[in-house]
Design a protein with these regions (language model features):
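Hydrophobic transmembrane alpha-helices of multi-pass small-molecule transport proteins
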Residues: 46, 50, 70, 118-138, ...
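Juxtamembrane helix-entry segments on the extracytoplasmic side of multipass membrane proteins
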Residues: 2-6, 28-36, 61-66, 138-159, ...
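Transmembrane alpha-helices of multi-pass small-molecule transport proteins
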Residues: 29-78, 105-106, 159-166, 180-198, ...
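Hydrophobic alpha-helical transmembrane segments of multi-pass membrane transport proteins
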Residues: 12-19, 23-26, 49, 70-85, ...
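Glycine-/small-residue-enriched transmembrane alpha-helix faces in small-molecule transporters
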Residues: 1-40, 44, 71-74, 82, ...
Length: 297
């Protein structure tokens, strides 16, 4: 794969990740069913990639690895359920922008968990995200469905941040595809008791959207990221990954006529700038960490 091809694959992967909220809105099913189906189809796609395309062998897992993968799988399940709840309540644009607040949570949690000193530019990042969220908030009223949806998406961002830090603590030993596959198995098992009674009611068309969500927005997108990281720098991949909200909001605008207000556009711009700046600042991020983060959305 040439650098130009790899960069194109990264953008296609980011576009697929950006379509997550779109397919979630198209599927007329509960968030529990959507997340269960997404995880189940993702397991199939990732298993295919691991079998035929991955250059990394299957790592034998120890007890500590299983515990970390189980924890990260539970966090991933919570992240996805809260995100799709936000999509159903408030729409794709608000859900995507609320989730995009995760770099601010990461900065704060890194200081608390890893005892890392928060730098001045990271404080600016937190301020940018905070102002962006204030501007994106439809109304400061908990009786507003859109505001409740935004809160669900912010919770999704918090859980994603915790998941990223969990992956960071355990990255390096387990190949990214293997870790993603195991995490999706945990997600499917977590949601199975809730989703099982509803599965017979899901229409064929909705299964199509869920399958696309699991195969393309999870399995194929993650596989493209992993393949392109062979020739692309981790920081470049992180910056491209930061464009995911732009793709998602643009498609939602075109498909669902979710026209953002000028205030929402300004808030979204601040949040996206914060994500790009965060990605460029992450000099310590290695390729396995970036791949793990990509798999988690």
């Amino acid at each position: 794969m040439t650098p130009r091809t790899a960069l194109g694959a990264l953008h296609i992967g980011a576009l697929m990740f950006g379509l997550t909220g779109v397919f979630g809105k198209l599927a007329a099913a509960s968030p529990a069913v959507i997340v269960f189906g997404r995880a189940a189809f993702a397991v199939l796609a990732l298993a295919f990639f691991a079998r035929f395309a991955s250059q990394h062998g299957w790592q034998k897992l120890q007890a500590v690895d299983w515990r970390r993968l189980a924890l990260s799988g539970v966090l991933l399940a919570g992240h996805w359920v809260s995100f799709f709840l936000s999509v159903k309540i408030a729409g794709v644009a608000i859900a995507t922008l609320g989730f995009a607040s995760f770099p601010a949570f990461t900065v704060i949690l890194e200081g608390l968990i890893f005892r890392e000193r928060i730098r001045a530019n990271e404080i600016v990042l937190v301020v940018l995200v905070s102002i962006g969220l204030i501007l994106v908030t439809p109304a400061f009223d908990l009786g507003s469905g859109a505001t409740i949806g935004l809160l669900w998406s912010v919770l999704s961002g918090l859980l994603f941040s915790l998941l990223s830090l969990t992956n960071r603590a355990s990255s390096g030993r387990i190949p990214a595809v293997q870790a993603a596959l195991c995490q999706n198995v945990v997600v499917a098992l977590c949601l199975l008791p809730v989703a099982a009674p509803q599965l017979s009611e899901v229409r064929a068309l909705d299964w199509l959207w869920i399958a696309l969500l699991g195969v393309f927005c999870t399995g194929v997108a993650h596989s493209l990221f992993v393949a392109s990281l062979a020739v692309i720098k981790a920081r470049t991949a992180a910056v491209v990954f930061a464009m995911e909200p732009v793709y998602g909001i643009t498609v939602a605008w075109l498909l669902f006529n979710e026209t953002p207000t000028p205030k929402m556009l300004l808030g979204g711009a601040l949040i996206i700038v914060a994500i790009v700046v965060s990605a460029r600042m992450s000099g310590h991020a290695d390729k396995k960490t970036v791949a793990a983060e990509a798999a988690s959305h």
